[in-house]
Amino acid sequence: MHSNKFRDPLISRAQPVTIITPIVDETLRMAGVSAVREEILDRFMNGQPRIAVVHGGDDHPPNVGSKETIRRMIRQIWANGGIPFEVSQSAPCEELSYGTEGMNYALLARNFCTASLASHIELHGYDAAVVFGVCDKMMVGSLRALIEADLAHQRRKARPVFATLIPSLIGREIRVMDDDRRKFEPLRHRLNETERAELDQLFHRPMKPHVYAQVKALLDRCFHRRIVQEGEKDDLERSIAKCSSVPGANCGASEASMVHRMVLASFGIVPRNLDISMKPPDDQQLSEVVKRLIQAIQKRERRVSVASLTRYNLTNAAAVWSATGGHPAWLLHLTYLADAIGKKLSIEDISKKTLKVPQILAIDDAAGNSVYSMAVENQNGGNSGIDTIMRTLAEKRLIEDRAPTLDGSWMQRIMEARSANGNFVYSTMTPFLPTCGMLGMHGNMCSAAIARLAPQNRNGIIQRFDRKIHLAIYYLGQKELQADLATLDGVLERLKRKVSREDLYYTWLLNWHSNSGNGAPPDLSEWNKAKLWTYLLSNKLLRAMIVVAGAGPHASGMPELQLALNASSHPLSGMCVLVTDGRVSFQHDGISIAHIVPEALDGGGLAAIRTADWIYLDLTHGEFQVVTQTPRGYKVLGAKELASRPDCKKRINELERRRLDLLPSFRILLDQVSSAEAGVSPTAKTN
């Protein structure tokens, strides 16, 4: 019975069959299949394909509503002659961690996910996997795990590993009910015109976590100003929270999730017509997916193994990343996957795609172009999801259409795809935006970084920040920033305490005096600090950089920062640039500079900046420099001079001490990953 002809130690050895048979029996029973144990034995000993069905745990938001589809997939694998194994492979939800110590663990959970699933596949000997989900950390981590296992199989001349990814369903969006809207009428009459407009704009959007968070932030500001009492505030928050607490509001239906779906699909491993789904796939669709996987396993189609598809489609994925809006997380994910297949690809290489590939996908809840609306159009035949995007890019030869997918080459697929109609997907001739807003940066504090301009900052507003001197507001670690964000005007007060009257006056003089527009500017030369501060704030002339050091991958795992939810009476994104060696949220609506290399812990110049330092920003040439005042204006500080500041060593020592507060099992990984430039990938520490 234990034949050696399959060259499979799980078959030739005695123990595996006795362990695996009851596992498969239980998996089938839970899926509603009354399997015969003898048939499980026969399939296992005859080398039938072993296919893992990988999904998130019960506490994983994108997994909501997927249980029945997972059971049907298990039934289809069994019905088509395979052996199904259910694998729960979850990743923590980053949305839950904002503002907490858990922020530090979100990105590297991707790496732990990779290690866990890769070892799982190697130990259990799976031939293929069907992965359900849409969380970028879980899906990218799982994809790299499958790549690593595939390459390991190929090195020992075993069967390649195959995979398909099935993104989570897009739930129905919910808008605020009329009854709940009416509860806000008494408060609405007490708000100023700007806040009324903000509230109306929020109520026109689908109720999702970030919308509820913005409503709560507005109510918090009103409470601080005593416009609303605590009891009334609690009732209003409860009414909106009920609208937002639905499956259609989770991360599976977020604007970011559409980018994740499209980039994952661009690798050719998402089945056709399943990249944007409102309804669960039917049994015929699932059966076709399973049959294709089993065919690839039995024929050993090395060209469509998971590692091969990733290698063939990596440059296509970079083009789709730019075309769908340039989500900053994928700068790290694409380099992480490139590292897995042994391909050299840096963040700078990916960002160059933005010079050639315009943004052609328009997803914006505020404008009515929601993810759910696009899913409705897709279901009604208005677009073909990733196939429409690939067809549009292929028209200008921005992708390699000869690259393979599990369902044939892109050239074959796009022949049947719908053309861009300008509702969600635009033509490259008339793109939604000429660029996705990502720029490579450098300066005396770093060798490389990435600037991102939110869509609302790409049409003229950028001139308010470009070629201006900004006053630094320095934080060592995200914990200090979170404390100030929770305090009314805490961030601005931090600058106000440190900045001098001369700093305010001369930065205003250099930034605005020559661009006064109509009429002569007021004479500020005799004004005191308090009067200058009030004038600059009220006229939106203050320019600052919120610098958060110690958020890099080696210092704290590269947490994701955002300024949207703060207690400031002045919108920070309208006057501040966010700078960090960590990550910045996709929802950030201002200008940000992130992924700074080298990070502060590694001796980067970011560790030496002080609050009230002058930083000159030149987005046109991709530069930002710490400068000092001179009689003729300012001069750029030398990189060595900046790094030699005494603050630098003290802060590095403090960051080393803070690392001891992280979880021990997490802390050991920090020294074993690369910098942000290489995707925070596994690396051997060399002495």
Locate the predicted segments by residue.
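Catalytic or ion-coupling anion/metal-binding cores of large enzyme and transporter domains
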Residues: 1-59, 80-82, 88, 102, ...
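Glycine-rich nucleotide/cofactor/substrate-binding loop typically near the N-terminus or early
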Residues: 75, 92-97, 375, 383
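N-terminal small/polar loop signature for handling phosphorylated ligands or for N-terminal nucleophile
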Residues: 87-124
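Proline-centered loop/turn at the N-terminus of a beta-strand
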Residues: 158-160, 575-577
